[in-house]
């Protein structure tokens, strides 16, 4: 792949398996409102968390190639599953363009904020099975105890817009019971779909726990990297994000409004 030289006016490229990465788009807009954003949601193949590592690595290459065709100055992997199993594929495909994954950003923040060194992680089956969060956290502080729980139904519930549904509360209660007796004071939302279910998650836990939203963590890290490289945009205002999707689900407009709290801009359909 032919690589390009990034400039301050180049866009920030972000990809995810579906609409969950829009939480990262929102966080980037809040942190850096002047930045142009290209977002690719692989809505035709969501969820990634139930796929094999080989398939996830294949998708990671294809998703990155789509973003690279738009000449970004940085690529944010807004998919924890790809961050856990295929970040090296993204980095190889991106060449000289820097890559930031949500997983490392979330792990770093969890280590900084935990007070009792008991951290919980929720994520897709693939992310949890990879042990990537626990490895990243204990690499930074070996004294931290990490308890992980796969919550595979959270992604389809978020994609359906079931943010306050009784079924969501029932499933959350079942999943989060895994943390009973572990005295966690910090919980990492190890999937970018999960912040949309944050209210149900915090209510279900019934105690004061610091919630780590990897979308917010990655926005701060992105700003620092771009500032250090003198690649922050000099524009006054940015246009709406340029949205690319591999399929246009009937509920996409509703989901966009749910995640972004704004109306859906133009959407471009791309083949994968």
UniProtKB/Swiss-Prot annotation:
DNA-binding as UniProt keyword: no
MF terms in GO: glutamate racemase activity
Superkingdom in the source lineage: Bacteria
Catalyses which reaction(s): L-glutamate = D-glutamate
Binding site for substrate: 16-17, 48-49, 80-81, 192-193
Top-level EC class: isomerase
GO terms classed as biological process: cell wall organization; peptidoglycan biosynthetic process; regulation of cell shape
Involved pathway(s): Cell wall biogenesis; peptidoglycan biosynthesis
Keyword tRNA processing: no
Residues of the signal peptide: none
Active site positions, chain numbering: 79 (proton donor/acceptor), 191 (proton donor/acceptor)
EC numbers on record: 5.1.1.3
Pfam families associated with the record: Asp_Glu_race
PANTHER family: GLUTAMATE RACEMASE (PTHR21198:SF2)
Stated family: Belongs to the aspartate/glutamate racemases family.
Function recorded in the entry: Provides the (R)-glutamate required for cell wall biosynthesis.
Protein name: Glutamate racemase
């Amino acid at each position: 792949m032919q690589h390009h030289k990034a400039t301050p006016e180049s866009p920030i490229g972000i990809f995810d398996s579906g609409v969950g990465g829009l939480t990262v788009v929102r966080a980037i807009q809040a942190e850096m409102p002047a930045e142009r954003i290209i977002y690719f949601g692989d809505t035709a193949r969501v969820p990634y968390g139930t796929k094999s590592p080989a398939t996830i690595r294949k998708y990671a290459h294809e998703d990155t190639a789509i973003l690279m065709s738009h000449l970004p100055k940085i690529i944010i992997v807004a998919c924890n599953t790809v961050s856990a199993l295929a970040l090296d594929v993204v980095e190889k495909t991106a060449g000289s363009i820097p890559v930031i994954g949500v997983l490392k950003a979330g792990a770093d923040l969890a280590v900084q904020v935990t007070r009792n060194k008991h951290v919980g992680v929720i994520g897709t089956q693939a992310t949890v099975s990879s042990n990537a969060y626990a490895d990243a956290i204990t690499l930074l502080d070996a004294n931290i105890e990490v308890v992980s729980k796969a919550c595979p139904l959270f992604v389809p519930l978020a994609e359906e817009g079931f943010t306050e549904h009784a079924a969501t509360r029932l499933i959350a209660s079942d999943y989060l019971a895994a943390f009973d007796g572990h005295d966690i004071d910090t919980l990492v939302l190890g999937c970018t779909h999960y912040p949309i279910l944050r209210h149900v998650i915090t209510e279900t836990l019934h105690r004061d726990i610091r919630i780590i939203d990897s979308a917010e963590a990655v926005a701060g890290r992105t700003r620092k990297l771009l500032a250090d490289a003198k690649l922050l945009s000099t524009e006054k205002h940015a246009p709406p994000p340029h949205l690319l999707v591999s399929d246009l689900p009937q509920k996409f407009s509703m989901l966009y409004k749910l995640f972004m709290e704004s109306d859906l801009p133009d959407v471009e359909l791309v083949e994968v």
